[in-house]
Amino acid sequence: MNEIERRRTFAIISHPDAGKTTLTEKFLLFGGQIQVAGAVKNNKIRKTATSDWMDIEKQRGISVSTSVMEFDYLPAGQEGAPYKVNILDTPGHQDFCEDTYRTLTAVDSAIIVVDSAKGVEAQTRKLMEVCRMRNTPVIIFINKMDREGRDPFDVLDELEEELKIKVRPLSWPIGQGARFKGVYNIYEHQLNLFTPNKQRVTEKVEVDIQSSELDERVGEREAAQLREELELVDGVYPKFEEETYRSAEVAPVFFGSALNNFGVQELLDCFVHIAPSPRPTQAEERLVKPEEPKFSGFIFKITANIDPNHRSCIAFCKICSGKFVRNQPYYHVRLDKNVRFSSPTQFMAQRKSTIDEAYPGDIVGLPDNGIFKIGDTLTEGEKMHFRGLPSFSPLLFKYIENDDPMKSKQFQKGLEQLMNEGVAQLFVNQFNGRRIVGTVGQLQFEVIQYRLENEYNAKCRWEPVHLHKACWIEADDEKELENFKKRKYQYMAKDIEGRDVFLADSGYVLSMAQQDFEHIKFHFTSEF
């Protein structure tokens, strides 16, 4: 395997509390990166989950910013070079959508975690839409099988209906809740017996599904039911083919319990075998292939203050082609100048280590002293722009004001850094000059206030503003655009990039504007 074929870069996504951070931790446990997994919610346990590292995340037991972790993994019994696995653990809380959407632009595949009792929830649907838009292959892990949940066939039906994708089980549960005996791994033809243990790995037995040994191991009734259900699975669901998975037509499904380490290794083993290595990336100018000799990459996330003792920013760069080498000058397309990086890093959540080189699929942290914005492209001299880092029209809006006139410099800097990170969107109203923050969820307002106070020593206050929708506008005819902006002056704003934004205060105002000015294009994402 060459360096590109070894790489597996993926995101783990789910609705809040479906067990995503726990699954991430178990992957790290199998990858030998951590010795003990942090029990996520339990405050009695000293260890806080490894992948949640911002203060506010530790307080609440939820992930609010994407963490990047990498480890080497070689499935048992396989020889040769290990796979290099890059995991992007995304926010699960329903308010943290922007960051998650953007993360999905930097991965080659995704694992969706579904709670066996709750099934598909609203956020999972939204994230699946983004995967579909980008043709990202997904594997589904149905979690919490050791608790009472719904019938597996019901959950599979719901997955197909709600996520609009065909599914194919590659493992099957034997009982559930108190009667949960284990799973039969259809992909490997193995029986995995369940012993509730958060640290230890499962007992595996090679068993022919028709043999009497199966009855001895799980009981006659359960064995008969398993045979019947597996027959049904083979009859109802398409035969598994790697091609249909990679082209995002079929989603393989695994069952297990992440908290008890159960079904996780089977998922990881199968994942590294079938998941795609880095795929070509679409730039505005052309398609960029990973095997091209020249380096290219894009910034999909900026994080301030990984270390609160240093006011540092780190820009996360996804490598698309060629080879990244430390200290070599690279062309920053937007700034039209060369930049070099003496201390690029790779991550294990907060622990970072300096690297000398990186390959397509890798995520590299570049020290950022204000030169990067989300979506920036780095190359070896070619002028190109990677597409697909959208901002979605926010759902909630508030005026933001500086609450301490003595700290206006800190307030300004903090707000600018947080907006560059993509925590929320900032619009400046052209009519009254006031700043409006737009977010996808209420919790983001709290995060902004908390981080301004704790990281920048600045205070803000929120004031209500009644807005229905923010849309980016453009027109082929410059005169038409200027006329619209004049006529609708009180509704006009600029975003952080200086683009024109129309802030409609009601659905009526928006639909009338669309009717009266048919030459104006209204966009609900900033990528057009």
Describe the function of each predicted region.
Residues M1-F528:
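Structural and coupling elements of P-loop NTPases
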